[in-house]
Amino acid sequence: MVKLTGFSKASPAERIEKLALAGLLSEEGLQTVRDNDTLPLSLANEMVENVLGTLALPFGLAPGFQVDGQEIQVPMVTEEPSVIAAASYAAGLIKRSGGFKTQVHKRQMIGQVALYEVSHKEKASQAITEAKEELLQLANQAYPSIVKRGGGARDLWTEVKGDFLICYLSVDPKEAMGANMLNTMLEALVDPLEDLSEGQGLMAILSNLATDALVTASCHIDYRFLSRDPKEAAEIAQKIALASQLAAVDPYRAATHNKGIFNGIDAVVLATGNDWRAIEAGGHTYASRSGQAQGLSSWIAHPDQQVLEGQLTLPMPIATKGGSIGLNPSVQVAHDLLGNPDAQTLARIIVAVGLAQNFAALKALVSTGIQHGHMKLQAKSLALLAGASPSEVAPVVQALLEDKPFNLEKARAVLENIRQSN
């Protein structure tokens, strides 16, 4: 078991040494972190258009997650204060109750060929269904390398929606996210589908609603870890369950509820070089599958067992290969810190982080209030914006916390007073 005692109170250099002592990174990985070695400008210029430079974000670590019995140190990239601290807090508390359990329901991507001007949709649908095996073979022939790796096209079906006959294709992309793979296969099917349907192909494109790549994370938290006061612990558990119910019935709350989940998910997706926009799009669409936006997680209080049960399910078509994953040295460090998991394991970890983030947010909301934990972080941000040096931040923060409410103007005044007194 890796112990990173005092990690949150250490300096960045001390944290890196703790990683070295724990054997979590190779010497090359340690050097990458020490040198703050990120994406070279020359490489960035080859990745996107009209490059001017690169934009850095804080790269942190949430230690002590236990997922399916394995201890995981989770890299997170985010500019938002409190996200990493909240994830770490929740991970530690949930680990004491047995950690997170996860389930990968399936891992396949879905794409579609939309057909229009189909005069006889039922007849066309039947013709496509009868040609299913031949169409799957054509799809695999369009991308033979994935078949060699054990993946490839798995299923094909049609649905009539409005004026469209839509042909869906599901593909096992193995360790890749599979966008290019799927699009190549789909485009290879357009001509034969037009012939079979006697219609026109409108578009062939993957879908970011990856309902064939659902992952569930769950946890059970003993009431005694919610508060030392048994009555207060039971009240917190009940309020967290009520907060979950609120997100299920009110889309205004659901949007913020789910945004909090993605505070954690996006941070890990970004750290591991994955497409956070695709994950967000799929997650938020999945949350609205009933016709109304709802919370992605659910929490149930069990007073008889003195246990709070949490669960989160969402599409997680994450990758460990392909795209820009191998280009950024910091991304490789993130994968190393995680133990270089395969795509399914990485998906399990990410959904567990989302559930941890959700628990931390809900517990704060129904007990101390969200601003209580944010005050010190807000004061620190104001101190930095006011121009405080690293040695000046702590006294400015202390002065602001002792004189609420505070703002940037007050932070500047406090900083000026500190400098004059020195």
Residues of each region from the PLM?
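Alpha/propeptide regions of enzymes that mature by internal proteolysis
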Residues: 1-45, 50-51, 88, 92, ...
